[in-house]
Regions:
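Helicase motor core with emphasis on the C-terminal RecA-like subdomain
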Residues: 1-182
Length: 182
């Protein structure tokens, strides 16, 4: 006789309506369920970086690439930095531009997106976990469900495709109790 019952868990840092989420998760079981919510404040530090000269369209042509030299000091100050770019093509361009500006970064920065070979993506993720990378230029491939404790800073180039995505990306840094997300 099996006395074990199915348990359903829903875990999220960004779900807005917890009661609605609980109803969706629990409806197949016809049970009420319990909401457990951490009552912790999360410190978030946001810094905007702008070009020295504001042109008509400061990011025209190549999204923010002219600000790559302003990103380098941020990378240098942090243990590990994730640089989120919205498209694969621009992530490759940013990765190469950072290497062109500072060739000494070779071997300490990496690229991660869905078209990168799975073996290389796994290598990047492992080296993020162990703190062996200074920075990773990435797309949404590192948005969700990842916990890389060495990450101290997240840079978002351009606008993310929504507030929830921005919060997910910001939450990749300082991903431990009491740590500040930057």
């Amino acid at each position: 006789v099996n006395t074990h019952q199915l348990q359903v868990w829903g875990i999220s840092a960004t779900v807005g309506n917890l009661d609605e989420a609980k109803a969706v998760l629990m409806s197949p079981l016809k049970e009420d369920g319990v909401i457990v919510k951490a009552n912790m404040d999360k410190a978030i530090e946001v810094e905007s970086i702008f070009p020295d000269e504001i042109e008509k369209y400061p990011w025209a042509g190549h999204l923010g690439i002219k600000l790559a030299d302003k990103v380098l000091p941020i990378i240098e100050k942090s243990r590990t930095t994730l640089i989120f770019i919205n498209t694969r093509g621009m992530s490759e361009r940013w990765y190469q531009t950072l290497l062109d500006i500072n060739p000494d970064l070779a071997g300490s920065i990496a690229l991660h997106h869905g078209s990168v070979d799975m073996e290389l993506r796994n290598w990047v993720e492992e080296n993020l976990h162990t703190g062996n990378l200074k920075a990773v230029v990435c797309t949404a491939s590192l948005d969700l469900g990842v916990d890389f404790r060495p990450v101290e800073t997240v840079i978002q180039v351009g606008s993310p495709k929504g507030v929830a995505r921005f919060l997910q990306r910001a939450g990749r840094s300082g991903h431990r109790p009491g740590a500040k997300s930057r």
